[in-house]
Amino acid sequence: MNLEDLMSLIKTSRKHKYIYHFTDADNLKSMETFGILSKEQQPQKLVFPRFTGGDSASRTSDKFRGIYNDVSLCLTRNHQMAFRCRKDGRHPNQIYLGISSDVLKFPGVRVALGLANAHTTKILPIEQAIPNIDIELLYTWVEDAPNFFPRMSALEKLRFSFQFAYRAK
């Protein structure tokens, strides 16, 4: 499967027609003005979110892994980090924003094959990452598939990274 095939599959899927960005509803006003900013871009635009997704340790890890200036998107509306943000109270009014799969064509798109700031997670250009994504499980109804829950858990850790400010329309 190539990038165009993946984008087409996302757009026509009955399960996930978008890729997603999770945040707290309190952050929508700045996103309407500036788009979805990376952690590095936020202070440059004088944007200081009241409810952030990462804690100080994750921000340090993001810098170490070279993803601090990336915008994070995910493939499902059930990302493990979103769950942690709700549980820890970092996103009391959490929402998922549906983002067009067209952003996958932007230069610099990478995929973290796991939690992006974990030291052992591979981060690959999207074209190289596609063969590692469980497309069948993501975009078809296969809840009775072998090893459904471990496979789904792995998918819920994937993260797309972008080095630009994406403004949702």
What would you call each of these model-derived segments?
Residues 1-72, 79-169:
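Active-site-proximal loop/hinge segments that shape catalytic or ion-binding/gating pockets
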